[in-house]
Amino acid sequence: MRLAFSTLAFPAAPLATALSLGRSWGYDGVELRLIDGELIDPSMPAAARTAVRRAADAAGLPIMAVDSSIRLTGEEPEADLHRFLELASDWESPLVRVFGGTLAEEKPARQAQLGAAARVLAASVPAAERLGVRIGVETHDAFSASAVVAELLALVDSPWVGAVWDSHHPHRMGERPAEIQRNLAGRVLLAQVKDARRAPERDDGWQLVPLGEGEVPVREMLRQLLAGGYQNWISVEWEKRWHPEIADPETALPQHLELLRGWLAGLEEGAR
């Protein structure tokens, strides 16, 4: 499997610096969430788009995903999604990440929201297919449980729409990797990895930690993915932008890469 890193790890660095460092450590690709420390604006001018593409080419790193802030249950997600699909196509990226958003607790309202989100995705499929860019719904927010993402994907029968399996959020919801793999079988377009431990003193109850030092079963996640024939990217999502107290990328990203390579080598050898 090829290993990438998210630019969330670089909240202040120029994109060229982040790319150069990632390449020097041995990463194979980059997941774009921040550009020069800012969230991606899909309406960026052509010159800025070209500069991003040139920076990635110069570093020798493909842009394997473009991460949006789109929430499918939010306001007017379809227009923003089309802009992100076009942006990803410009960068020859195969994937746009989206969030599901919020869901009501009452069943009728919840079902209506799921239906509306499914219609947004279905309406975007022709553009996705034309541009050669898939849409991945992340296990996040009200869709943190893979069962909820699977419920949405069951309403959109298209190979151009799938899931982004974030290692942390389904674990928070009490799901184990084997269960997640069953729920998302055949539709995982990207696997994002991070580790965390319980931290009752924090508002969200969790603290991100170096890979292997928390309780998120990332190695088992990888085993399940390999057993299921997964051949897409593994991306390290070190969220320095959202959690400034965690280690700098110069420490965290090489550590993640070394451990992931070791785990994957062992799992692949054991599968032979």
Regions found by a protein language model. Name each.
Residues 1-7, 11-28, 53, 57-59, ...:
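Histidine-acidic metal/acid-base catalytic patches
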Residues 44-50, 78-83, 110-121, 176-180, ...:
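Charged helix-capping and loop-helix junction motifs
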Residues 31, 65-67, 97, 136, ...:
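Conserved beta-strand positions in the central sheet of alpha/beta enzyme cores
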Residues 9-11, 34-36, 69-72, 100-104, ...:
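Active-site-proximal loop/turn and secondary-structure-junction residues that shape catalytic pockets
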Residues 31-53, 103-106:
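Glycine-rich, proline-tolerant flexible connector loops at the mouths of alpha/beta enzymes
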Residues 1-4, 62-70, 101-103, 200:
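N-terminal small/glycine-rich loop or linker at the start of catalytic domains
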Residues 39-42, 111-112, 205-210:
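Short glycine-enriched, charge-decorated loop/helix-capping segments at active-site entrances
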